């Protein structure tokens, strides 16, 4: 939720002065089946607890059940770079704005779990296999942002937002949510729920035992976010003793997720809790489901946090504590001044993987809900460029924000306007310009450029066809010449004699020409782009050991080339620790 995108800050906080700890053994085997125990004593205890906790009254049975042959494997997908993630906001995912004012009012229907089911076939057809669902909790109503409250200002972590429930359906809130999850699972779509890092002001008043306080007795608030209050993870920070009540709350959140069939958790601002907290909570989840996946919102190494009241960022610490995947820095792709800076970042991540347990990875965070729409960085061509890159980069699981598929720029007519109808104490329709609305009951995400979604589907299909090369193969940085402004990105992915060649123009405004060294490439190599054409055309010509290119603005091309021995003639070869 909170991040820095200043490239100078990033550069000043480079990892090169960090001494990494030895790689730790993973808590659980990622290929393990759901855990069973041979301990008769433990079985007796669990059976006894089940009898003690059995409800006194008969509970309504859910009308849907998880498919009998469904097994969670989200953690393995993360660790094998096989997740293709779509981020959604349930209250807007299938909202029906009929009068065109871009928010839901009158008798219009906002998004619910049940009407979200209507879009799942679309999600599957687009190529996604995982949903990242932004927080589903009731939002705080006091000191609120927007007329529906920020999704990251939860009033109750163990409850479900009434906005997400269809009042005409007789099932309970959790049964309706489970019906949605079951429909996802029928399509082999995994469900990852967002865990907010902070509390609403409402929760702060109700549960002071969970809250962090300043030395002057005031509530600790993250800089720039007046609607939320920070949790206190410590009972005694000097002794590194955790706050047992806050830890228990989060265990109950994990239990709720697993009981409902959720496959994993995305932790908002993971650094808001110390590694000791995650050292307990993540293994706790794996005791119940060894395949329960964990994604940390963490970006880059920081010597000190640039934000008041927020701990410094330490991605490696989060990964060692048990997180499977992190955000990383692809969201500042547009800020990297040249191709070399971008390539160096990729290599840093691959090098980092060897200081960690095997299989740690990143999401393709070229755009998240915290970032402005990629449409502002170069329109549809930029969207296609970043899609082609994240479809082929190593150590990465592609990640898309709902609305990207058709070029939503997340500009809302009602931005900051007064609305007499509100669910909170705020009548202002707060919006962060250019970002997906998380404060109001807004329209269904979407733009008017469906060709972006078509390109995305083709990129996913290409990734699936060459899955082993892309998820397991080496990453080869290719040398180039005559690229005066260093705008051409050129690399190969190689495995077992099969090679994919990727060339892209980072410049979104003009064509760029150069020569790329491709060892063992033949002059008669056919160059058939595995991705759809778009934008201004490119000119490419194969020569022996070299490729001449004049790439159109923001163009990306992927070719399968016949270079089974390319690794024998390259010295910039990198591989993820998997």
Language-model features: where?
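Non-Sec secretion/translocation targeting segments of pathogen effectors
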Residues: 1-65, 578
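Active-site-proximal helices and loops of the catalytic beta/alpha 8
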Residues: 66-67, 181, 185, 189, ...
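Active-site-adjacent "subsite" loops/lids of carbohydrate-active enzymes
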Residues: 201-260, 270-271
